[in-house]
Amino acid sequence: MKKIYLLALMLIFVLNTAAQDFRYGKVSEEELLEKQHPKDPEVNAAVLYKSHKVHYDYNSINGFSLITEVHERIKIYNKEGFEWATKKLVNSKSGSDEVKVSGIDGETYHLENGKVKSDRLRNDAIFKDDLNKYLTSTTFTMPSVLEGSVIEYKYTLRSPFLISIDDILLQYTIPINNLEIDVKIPEFFVFWSHFNPRAKLEFKIDRSTKIFRYTNLQTTRSGGIAVSHSIKNNKIEFLENTYSIDKKDIPALINENHVGYLNNYAAVLIWELQLTNFPNSTMENYTQTWDGVAKKIYDHPEFGNELDKSRYFESELDDLLKNLSLPKDKISVIFNFVKAKVKWNDYAGYYTDNGVKDAFKDGAGNVADINLMLIAMLKYAGLKADPVLISTRDNGVPLYPTRNGFNYVVAGVSLNNELIFLDGTDKYLEVGMLPYRARNWQGRIIREDRSSEWVDLMGGSTSEKTTRLNIKLDDQFHFEGQITEELDGFYAKTYREGFADLNNDERIKKLEQSNGKIIISDLDVQNEKEIDKNIKKSFKFELPDGAEEIGNNIYLNPLLFLTTTSNPFKSEDRQFPVILKYPSSIINTVNIMLPNNVKVESLPANQALSINDKDVLFKYVVVQNGNFLRISTELTLNTILYLPEEYEVLKEFYNQIILKNTERIVLIKT
């Protein structure tokens, strides 16, 4: 009996080991049969296994290279998970040096008549591209992916940039069942490793040290007719520090609305070089300050030198400025000139790609090409303009001083004790506005004397939307009326992005679709092209079914299609802070003329709401004057950050708004 028991235990162990075989190509039938994730059934895909190994390779010809080897196995549960079948690698280059991608291998596995079949990733499905002179991309999409497939791929990166180990992502928006991290660093490189402090997960790093021996045998030949051979044995010996993580069941990073950039909260292993100390060489300290980082960036020829160039634009700019004396007028004219002259090529960066002169001539450039040109023009016009370094939302919030902490640059103009931001990459941006991607907490302004300091990016004026409805309810209880609306700030920008390229019929159709069952006529929009002016919009409308007739009573929602009916905050709890896009204010005024065959039975009560210690307000006021009703609402959100512990209060604030917005006026027939 004891032997049978031991045999059973051994069998279970063997079966379990077989199911957990993560060697490349060893996908099991059990993995393919799995219909949903056992611990998170709602996910569309899951990483069954991820291996990320980093080490330094050495040879006597080229010295050290930094090698990264990645192997991932991913289960696709449904069609929504197909996006995980495409992998894009973006790598650095500098001059003739670049990160080389090699050894890309991939297989898609599926079951066919009970047998495991696979389709191999073909070379013609791997695409390599030079994004700009600083970045390359390698993209591949796994073949023949179906619901239930398992995909597997591996690749190797060989980098000449020895002092830069890429951050290692330890958490995805899908679960990771098994994670293995192994980083080996020679004693000559001293890195500080730490985790993203905003992440909710904790990981343990196992550290160990061993002696690494490298042996190189060189054969030489000498002599004329008589040849002699000698073998030279070169040995290099050094300590190698190993950092390992072996973790199972890493939960998915849950996306929450109004979270900013989700990966800011992902578990990440971050590497910062402290120093290098090679034999027979002086120790070099790489620890930096933010002042030092800013100075190095400014002194780079593709940054500071570009700010000094002006001859290429002087004649055109002189013509534009000759009748202007007020600084605000100069700012507006120069800003609009740059936006019209140079189109953004969708690439970020604080170093120029084409260079400001070629970008001006060709009409296209990256962020630095455009905004360093803008700064140079502003300075030429006598304004105090300086570059502001930014980390975009998808680049995260910089945690320690490094040039990689920034990836964007805008102009900052100091005028009347105010810092005015300008970004020429978006034709719909107004003076003083930053695009959402660049509104990421703090930027670093660098002055001409190389001094620098942090500046707030999240402030700015409140974006306002003011709407007035004048409505007549006829004796058949149908609505007809006119709406006038004024939009500024980001509300105006959003309108221009969505409507500027549409013809009138297309605009009416889009407005009708977004405003319930109204029928629109006489649409008029002003200041669409004048970006520095507010959008003014008006149209007439009919709404046949705006009131509900039950017996002798008529029920109507006085806000009609302006009603907020859905709470953006639905989840029971909150892991991450709520970050609204910008301060905002929405003011609605509805004037209703009632027919003579009804009288008011009941009206919603007036209400005012606020959140303690927040610049947040909601007001709802109803006034009756005979057959005329006026309903006024205001929602002002000047506070854009709410911590998780404030989530319940914010959620309830919106619940109360929705309850009030859905209250109805009751009329009675006379």
What is each model feature region?
Residues Q20-Q288, G292, K296, D369-I375, ...:
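Beta-strand-rich, non-transmembrane domain signature
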Residues P143, L326, K330, A359-I370, ...:
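Secondary-structure capping and boundary motifs in well-ordered enzyme cores
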Residues E80, S159, L321, V338-V342, ...:
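Sec/Tat-exported extracytoplasmic proteins
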Residues K509-T670:
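A carboxyl-terminal module marker
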Residues D318-N323, T467-R468, Q575-L580:
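Extended, non-catalytic structural segments that build the interaction scaffolds
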Residues W84-K88, F195-P197, N305-F313, V333-I334, ...:
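Short coil/turn segments at secondary-structure boundaries
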Residues T289-D362:
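Secondary-structure boundary elements
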Residues M1-R23, T670:
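Bacterial Sec-dependent N-terminal signal peptides
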